[in-house]
Design a protein with these regions (language model features):
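Bacterial Sec-dependent N-terminal signal peptides
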Residues: 1-23, 198-206
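Catalytic-loop region of hydrolases
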Residues: 19-106, 407-409, 416, 420-423
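Conserved alpha/beta-hydrolase
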Residues: 100-119
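Alpha/beta-hydrolase active-site loop
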Residues: 127-146
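Alpha/beta-hydrolase fold nucleophile elbow
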Residues: 148-158
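Glycine-rich nucleophile elbow surrounding the catalytic serine of serine-hydrolase chemistry
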Residues: 156-166
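Alpha/beta-hydrolase
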Residues: 166-305
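C-terminal subdomain of alpha/beta-hydrolase-fold enzymes, centered on the catalytic histidine
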Residues: 260-423
């Protein structure tokens, strides 16, 4: 009888707790969170708002200096799941994840520390690491689970997808399902698996055309430099950090093959040859490789990204041996030029090994999504041990691979896996 009474009391308590669910406005008011602005709504959501959450710069010293972290809340109903989108970079624009749209549920998008509005007044580089960022996300999950007690799904694209992995590596109980898109797991500041990938991706004919263009652009760089300079001046790009305009030009040519396969914007039949005008060569190269990537303007804005790549997340470089006889300026294949020598860049080689071990032995409920031809698939997660997790490669896919542009059958497989993890 006593057991029945206790069970009944527990049910009443749970029912009262359910009745006590507060509105979004009440929750924000209780937590002292101020709305920055309301975004134009979509029919899916009751409201979409931007708010700022106070976070310690150093979570090991919670009473020390703090910064405000930007998040977007897309609210439907507390009884529905939440998709947490980890931006990885700034979150200067809002978007609805395709998973959120599929589930018609709540969404929280989180801007990464040291980017956009989530940049501290002082840049203490030692506090820009994967644990600090994961703890930012842990604090947000812990806070908003009071409002949204149902299942949580974390997802992100590219570096945002890496952020998903690191968050669950440090805090495996925070979310129920993880969906990283096109997220590499790199094992060094120059992961040489990239070179092997570029030697085998696509068809031999297409690879030859890509390499032929690079050799032409380097061998005849004197013919194209004026057009490169004119284009850069028009865009407002400067290249002091890279080492000057001539060096930047060579880096752009070296980047061409990586970017060509990463994005898949231009078919090989559109690659220009020697007969093309200098301006056409430069326009094409910019469309594929993006000259802004080596500009002072880009490097300064995205220096937090380069710091993470060069200290924990790993990155890529260029196989200079292939083009050695054509290079006049570049002799460093990696991106250490993005920082002054006064900033210590020491790479933590053990972290990626530990993350891979976690994915092999402990991780569950992951859905990894990659594009077959995306250069970042060279360092994709391909080993998950006996986990129930799933890995999907879209045939011929690029870094733009998403669930909704997969073939119908594969798309159904992804959403079937997602549904099984949520039930």
């Amino acid at each position: 009888m006593k057991k029945l009474f206790l069970t009944g009391a527990l049910l009443i308590f749970v029912a009262l707790q359910a009745l006590a669910v507060v509105s979004l406005d009440e929750f924000l008011s209780q937590k002292g969170i101020k709305e920055v602005r309301t975004l134009q709504n979509e029919s899916t959501f009751e409201r979409i708002i931007e708010v700022l959450i106070e976070q310690p710069i150093d979570h090991r010293n919670p009473d020390g200096e703090s910064f405000m972290q930007r998040i977007y809340i897309s609210h439907v109903d507390p009884s529905l799941p939440v998709v947490m989108v980890t931006a990885g970079y700034d979150a200067n624009y809002y978007y609805t994840s395709e998973i959120t749209a599929e589930l018609r549920c709540n969404q929280i998008m989180v801007e990464h520390r040291y980017f956009g509005k989530s940049t501290p007044d002082s840049l203490y580089w030692q506090y820009l690491d994967t644990w600090q960022a994961a703890t930012d996300h842990h604090m947000i999950v812990s806070l908003f689970k009071e409002l949204y007690p149902e299942q949580w799904i974390s997802t992100g694209i590219s570096k945002g997808g890496q952020t998903v992995m690191y968050h669950s590596y440090y805090y495996p109980e925070d979310v129920d399902v993880r969906v990283p898109y096109v997220a590499p797991l790199n094992f060094g500041v120059e992961d040489e698996r990239i070179y092997s990938f570029l030697d085998h991706v696509g068809s031999p004919k297409e690879r030859r055309k890509v390499k032929k263009f690079q050799k032409m652009a380097l061998k005849n760089q004197e013919d194209y430099l004026d057009a490169f300079k004119a284009f850069s001046e028009k865009k407002g790009y400067t290249y002091e950090l890279t080492g000057g305009v001539e060096k930047a030009y060579e880096y752009c040519v070296l980047e061409y093959s990586f970017a060509y396969w990463q994005w898949g914007y231009v078919p090989s039949k559109k690659i220009p040859g020697k007969a093309a005008k200098a301006e056409e060569i430069i326009e094409h190269m910019n469309r594929v490789a993006g000259f802004d990537y080596f500009s002072d303007q880009f490097i300064v804005e995205y220096r937090p990204f380069f710091y993470q790549a060069l200290t924990e997340m790993g990155y890529y470089g260029y196989d200079l041996d292939v083009f050695e006889k054509y290079l006049q300026h570049v002799d460093n294949p990696i991106f250490t030029f993005t920082f002054p020598e006064s900033v210590e860049l020491s790479f933590n080689e053990g972290l990626s090994v530990d993350l891979q071990k976690y994915l092999n032995e402990e991780a569950e409920n992951y859905i990894f999504i990659y594009g077959e031809y995306d250069t970042w698939s060279a360092t994709a997660v391909t080993s998950i041990g006996d986990s129930n997790s799933k890995i999907f490669f879209k045939e011929g896919g690029s870094h733009r691979t998403r669930i909704n542009n997969m073939p119908k059958e594969q798309k159904e497989e992804v959403y079937t896996a997602l549904g099984s993890f949520l039930h």
